[in-house]
Amino acid sequence: MIVLVGSNKGGPGKSTTAINLAVGLALRGHDVCGCDADKQHSFSIWHAFRQEQEVKPEITLVQAEGNISKTLLALDQKFDFVVVDVAGRNSTEFVTAGVVADVIIAPHLASQLDMSTIEELKKQYENWQLLNEDLKLYVYHTRGNTNASVKKKERAEFLEFMSEHPELAVLDAVNYERKPYRDSIPFGLGVLELKGRGAEDAKEEVIQLMNEVFPV
């Protein structure tokens, strides 16, 4: 299965989402390959840390650029899951990956700048479905505010905006801005692999995302 993590705005946590999905799927016992198709190479940097620390389970990682559709189809023949991290803004990598993906998870912040790209995403989805009719796309609310006085209002505003785009499914799972997501990177870990109680909220968020998109 090809899982594409992408959106048209920088900064919503695409790489963080891809990393934690890859780890979560590997911990379920799947053979997972990450595909880093973003020139910032955050996925690759994290993977290098993981190799240095010799963390198990192993996750394969490849880099790709340009038209990556054939690369992804070839990887899909070898691995249970291919998790793809792409650059945004209608990049060649994003567009060509969408043609062959099984699932797209589209991280978005609850900000005007992020939400202003939803119309573009909707048009992309319509075009992908002309060639890939079984493609599923989920909008994922990311980097939410954990402040109790803001949290519910922010989520309500996100859902209200998305209600204007019923063609796009919105995940119930929400990712919040939490320190464990950052702390796990230099150790080559996903938050599910962190020890201690401080990561419990982040772990629950990843588990909810996993169970919603990839129910056991």
Please provide the spans of the model-predicted regions.
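Structural beta-sheet core signal
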Residues: 34, 84, 106, 139-141
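Inter-lobe coupling/hinge region of RecA-like P-loop helicase motors
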Residues: 182-203, 207
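P-loop/Walker-type NTP enzyme "switch/lid" segment
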Residues: 2, 6-8, 12, 21-88, ...
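Hydrophobic positions on the alpha1 helix immediately C-terminal to the Walker A/P-loop
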Residues: 17
